Amino acid sequence: MSNNKKEIMKFYTMPETRAFLESIGMPGGDLYDLPTSEKRFPDGGQYRFEVPGIQGPGPMKALLEALDEYGIQIHRVTQTKGIMFLTDEEISKMVEYAKKWNVQLVLACGPRATTDTSASVKTEEGQRMGYRLRGEEQIARGIEEIRRGARLGVRGFLIYDEGLLWALNEARKNGFIPADCHFKVSAHSGHGNPCSAHILETIGADSINPIRDIQIQMLAAMRAAIDVPIDLHTENPKSSGGFIRHYEVPDFIRVAAPVYLKTGGSVAANHSYDTTEKEARQRAKQIMLVKRVIDTYYPEAVVSPKITK
């Protein structure tokens, strides 16, 4: 073999690529040794509970009352259809319930690819664009959504587009929206690796929801790259695969803390499903089932006190 070929083969070795990734502050690959995360929420907690897909005040109240009956606390309630689908009165009522039960309320930005006039997103190929926004007009409308929610007392917002996230972070820094606004990046943005998560963190994400089927070793690598909380689905609606990950939750907590455990999704048919009050109570039961797994297999795990920050 010529010296030239030897040099080429040496140059393209995987160890060098892994070393380069580590030199720029990223893990060199997925962390199969599953290291325990020492990172925590500010209160010292490793995990918090989140219930997604609560689209209005009726289901929200039913959920929180059912949780009281079970004696279980949660920390975050998330609406996914969009602020533009709620009246001012409905938003104000949800803010009222969030204060009464001391949970963080997260409302979704309404404008997205699936509600735009574009035909592309309805096609097999176009679906790959996810919920991302098309055109600057949609960015402006997205900012208006967040401003409206903020005026009504909302501070947590679910974001689907990286450009909108960046613009909102600039708005937050410049005082155009309240400085205490919290931006949660949706799993529908399609991120599933440490480098992507790092980008989201640098442009303003306060918590990141990776793709739903991310594996434990991938999750460990993501945690090594970022400090913000990671939001993880413990179960999923049929439209997202329908898989249940309850027995993986102890490992979620151990390798990825601080984490929000998104629970109750298996009750829904799809992402923007209108959960009924009866189904909201079923979601409360799912929280109890996940808590049982944690208490059995990782009893030393520390849950955050019931706070909203």
Regions found by a protein language model. Name each.
Residues 2-154, 159-191, 209, 216-309:
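Active-site pocket-lining/capping segments in soluble small-molecule metabolic enzymes
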